[in-house]
Structures are given as structure tokens and as C-alpha cells.
């Protein structure tokens, strides 16, 4: 039984899907005017884990994440680079797939784009105007916020609270300062589309409402995104969607915490703005992913090199223990009286599932993985090992790897295959027996250059990848 924290109700709730065995999930994606930063990577990774865990529990997940390919930032970038908005969007959509692919994020079921849904957006806005929820003014179209009675229910703010500080900017023609834009009148030189309201382009909030509606229907199970989107973006999505669809927009709302850089908010002005495109050249993407899930998704996370190094060390510990298990699989036998270890492995798996069922607590799930590694390290020191126990270890390691999306072997592990390493170790042993120490040292140095470290153990020479 999976429980998750619902921002809408401010409490944990048992997940009950609209359709048995199926999860309809919408995650707000990036505005594709630049490479994504690590703040964008966090929701991509966190909600990928959520999806993976639902699938592990037998659900069919329809996972939709959009691309905002029409926006003020894109238009500004287009003018700076003297390139068309579609050209820039295509470049950074491709870059997004490359970056999150390196972080082992699975491809979405669908990645809708605003430009592909322009006719749908225009019709959606027209429907809202016809229903009295929106109005045209000065070439723009605005949503009548006060007409939607539930406005503020996600961010838990009242209309009176929101009215304080609300204002009408120059050039706006709103009836009320709280109203927000659905359609923007075209400006000279900007990309625009024909509509019943005149030339223009959609506002940001309406885009997600329409794409979610056309991809997943009037009501979805889970809508997710960063905490910064809770208000006004997600609040406005609810207002538009529920006014139009006459049905709840999403049953569960999930929001992930912020990322700080050395305990400071990430911003261009502070010079601590980190692009995934750049950082994965310096930090192993598997380590970056492991670091991101080492903290519960709703908690803020602090990024610095010391903490990333700690994550690298922790992942290495897990991988080294798995390598030991794989090595012992070669000499394991069918021996009895191993139920104690089977029971201990099952207990760790049960704990992993328990903490993941509790609002996808990846931090505690990783603790369970460490405990599995500790037990594995203990088991391989036994004089004899059981095929049944070794297979059980391998199966549970694979479950943890699949759910958390962290591979059991480094992407560089195939530079020199394990069997090739074993052959070189045998050759080195023979060289040492024959007192050919020059050759033995040559092999050791060659392995070291491949980041392979040799260790003498009671069972003979073994290796690990550094």
C-alpha cells in the first residue's frame, strides 16, 4: 500500500488510482531555451524513481512530461542569437534528452510540446470565454480568478490574502488585479498564431492544462513538479482545468524541494548556476543521481563537492559488495542450512519496500541498500557459499538498482571486461611464481591505469574498480 504526501491536503494519503492498476502522471517539464541546470534535474530524477516504484509494484504508468517551447525566455534567446524559436527549442530538447539520459532517467510515455497543441489551446481558451471564466481585453485574454471558487486551495491562500500586493502592470487591461493571462497579444517581431482573439500566443499556465487534458484526460492521478511551481503555476492550472473540465484536475499533487549550492540559493547573479551539461563532465552521472536521491524528495538538498564525494564513496561501497557476490557466484555450491541469510535478505527487501511505500523515502531506501551490502560483505567471508543465497543477493541488488535507477556497474566498467582482468591476474600470478617481477609489475601498472585495484585476500587475489 503506497502512501504519498498530497500538497493539496497537506497530509499523507493512501494512493487510490482512478483506474485500477494504472497511474496517470503529469510532470511539468523545462522551458527549452538553454541546457537544464541541476535544479531541473532533481524533479526529473525524483519522479523517475516514483514511476519506477509504481511499475515495480505492478502499475502501468502513463508518464507525461511537457516541453515549453513557446515562452518569453525563448523569444528573448531567439532575438539574442538571431535564430528562430523552433530552432532553439529543437536544440535544447535534444540536449535535455541527452542530459537526463546520462542520469538514467527513463523516457516519458509522451513529451508534448506547446507548438503541437496550439489549436487545442486556442479552443480551450475559447471554451473558457464562452463559459464566462475568461474575457478578452485589449487583444489579451484573462482568466476571471474570483469566478473560480476554489482558487487558492493548493497553496492554501485566500483571495483576500492574494489581493494584498496584487497589481495591474502598465499595458495590462484586467478587470481585477488577481486575473492572469491566458492569451498574449502579439508584439512586433515575436512568434505568434492566429486566433479568434487576434494574433498572439498562449500564457504559460494554460499550456500545461491543455497538454495534460489532451494526453491524460480531464482528471489525472498525480501532478508533480518543483516547489517553486506550486504558486502561481499549479494554482492557475487547477483553476483553468477545473473550470473547463468540470472535474477535479489532479487527485494528488507532489512537489520536490529546492537545491542549494554550498548552502546558498542557486542563481546566475551569485555565479553558482550549475548546468547538468557541464557537471556530468566532472561528476559521474550515476554518482550525481545517487546524490540526488540520498535526500527525501520533499526536503531541500545542499550541493557541494564534499557531499558529492560522500555519495561517490557510498555508491562504490555498494558496487564493490555486488562485485564480491558476482565473484563468489563462480564457486558457489548447493549447500543447505542457509535459511538465516535468506531471511535476512528478505527482511532488508521488506524494509526497502516499507520505506518506499511511505512517500517514496529514497534516503531510507539507500540505507537498506547499505545494509544489504554489509550483509553481502559478511557472507562472502564464509568458507562456502550457497548458490541459492548468492542468487537471492543478486536478485535483491537488481531490484534496488532498477527501482532507484542506479546501475550496479559503472558505465566505464566495460573498458576492460572482467574475464580479461581475471586472465591478466592469472598471468601476473604465473609471472610472480616464475620470479618474472618485471612482467608482474607491468600487469599491475596496466590494471591500475584502468582504475583496477588488486587486493590480496585469503581466497586469493581479487580486484575492484576504483
Curated annotation (Swiss-Prot):
GO terms for molecular function: ATP binding; cysteine-tRNA ligase activity; zinc ion binding. It is found in: Cytoplasm. ATP binds at residue 268. Binds 1 zinc ion per subunit. InterPro entries: Cys-tRNA-ligase (IPR015803), Cys-tRNA-synt_Ia_DALR (IPR015273), Cys-tRNA/MSH_ligase (IPR024909), CysS_C (IPR056411), Rossmann-like_a/b/a_fold (IPR014729), tRNA-synt_1_cat_dom (IPR032678), tRNAsynth_Ia_anticodon-bd (IPR009080). GO terms for cellular component: cytosol. Its cofactor is Zn(2+). It catalyses: tRNA(Cys) + L-cysteine + ATP = L-cysteinyl-tRNA(Cys) + AMP + diphosphate. A motif ('HIGH' region) lies at residues 30-40. It comes from the Bacteria. Keywords: Aminoacyl-tRNA synthetase, ATP-binding, Cytoplasm, Ligase, Metal-binding, Nucleotide-binding, Protein biosynthesis, Zinc. A motif ('KMSKS' region) lies at residues 265-269. Belongs to the class-I aminoacyl-tRNA synthetase family. Monomer. This is Cysteine--tRNA ligase. It comes from Staphylococcus aureus (strain JH9). The gene is cysS.
Amino acid at each position: 500500500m503506497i502512501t504519498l504526501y498530497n500538497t493539496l491536503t497537506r497530509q499523507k494519503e493512501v494512493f487510490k488510482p482512478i483506474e485500477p492498476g494504472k497511474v496517470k502522471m503529469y510532470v511539468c517539464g523545462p522551458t527549452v531555451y538553454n541546457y537544464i541546470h541541476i535544479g531541473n534535474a532533481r524533479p526529473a530524477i525524483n519522479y523517475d524513481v516514483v514511476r519506477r516504484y509504481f511499475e515495480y509494484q505492478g502499475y502501468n504508468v502513463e508518464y507525461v512530461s511537457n516541453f515549453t517551447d513557446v515562452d518569453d525566455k525563448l523569444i528573448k534567446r531567439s532575438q539574442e542569437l538571431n535564430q528562430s524559436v523552433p530552432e532553439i527549442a529543437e536544440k535544447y530538447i535534444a540536449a535535455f534528452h541527452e542530459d537526463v539520459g546520462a542520469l538514467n532517467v527513463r523516457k516519458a510515455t509522451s513529451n508534448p510540446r506547446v507548438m503541437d497543441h496550439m489549436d487545442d489551446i486556442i479552443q480551450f481558451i475559447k471554451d473558457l470565454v464562452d463559459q464566462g471564466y475568461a474575457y478578452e481585453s485589449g487583444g489579451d485574454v484573462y482568466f476571471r480568478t474570483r469566478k473560480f471558487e476554489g482558487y487558492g486551495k493548493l497553496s492554501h491562500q485566500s483571495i483576500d490574502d492574494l489581493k494584498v500586493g496584487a497589481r495591474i502592470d502598465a499595458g495590462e487591461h484586467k478587470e481585477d488585479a488577481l486575473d492572469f493571462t491566458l492569451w498574449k497579444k502579439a508584439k512586433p517581431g515575436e512568434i505568434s498564431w492566429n486566433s479568434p482573439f487576434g494574433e498572439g500566443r498562449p500564457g504559460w499556465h494554460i499550456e500545461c492544462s491543455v497538454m495534460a487534458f489532451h494526453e491524460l484526460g480531464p482528471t489525472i492521478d498525480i501532478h508533480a513538479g518543483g516547489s517553486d511551481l506550486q504558486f502561481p503555476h499549479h494554482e492557475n492550472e487547477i483553476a483553468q482545468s477545473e473550470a473547463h473540465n468540470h472535474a477535479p484536475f489532479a487527485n494528488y499533487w507532489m512537489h520536490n524541494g529546492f537545491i542549494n549550492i554550498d548552502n546558498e540559493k542557486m542563481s546566475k547573479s551569485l555565479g553558482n548556476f550549475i548546468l547538468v551539461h557541464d557537471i556530468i563532465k566532472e561528476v559521474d552521472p550515476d554518482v550525481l543521481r545517487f546524490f540526488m536521491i540520498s535526500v527525501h524528495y520533499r526536503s531541500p538538498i545542499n550541493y557541494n563537492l564534499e557531499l558529492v564525494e560522500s555519495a561517490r564513496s557510498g555508491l562504490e561501497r555498494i558496487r564493490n559488495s555486488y562485485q564480491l557476490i558476482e565473484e563468489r557466484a563462480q564457486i558457489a555450491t548447493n549447500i543447505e542450512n542457509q535459511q538465516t541469510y535468506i531471511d535476512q535478505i528478505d527482511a532488508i527487501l521488506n524494509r526497502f519496500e516499507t520505506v518506499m511505500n511511505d512517500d517514496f523515502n529514497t534516503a531510507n531506501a539507500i540505507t537498506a541498500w547499505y545494509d544489504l551490502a554489509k550483509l553481502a560483505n559478511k557472507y562472502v567471508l564464509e568458507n562456502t557459499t550457497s548458490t541459492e543465497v548468492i542468487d537471492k543477493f543478486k536478485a535483491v541488488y537488481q531490484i534496488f538498482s532498477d527501482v532507484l535507477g542506479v546501475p550496479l556497474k559503472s558505465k566505464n566498467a566495460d573498458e576492460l571486461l572482467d574475464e580479461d582482468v581475471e586472465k591478466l591476474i592469472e598471468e601476473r600470478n604465473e609471472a610472480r611464481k616464475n620470479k618474472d617481477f618485471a612482467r608482474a609489475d607491468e600487469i599491475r601498472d596496466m590494471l591500475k591505469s584502468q582504475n583496477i585495484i588488486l587486493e590480496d585476500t585469503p581466497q586469493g587475489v581479487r580486484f575492484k574498480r576504483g
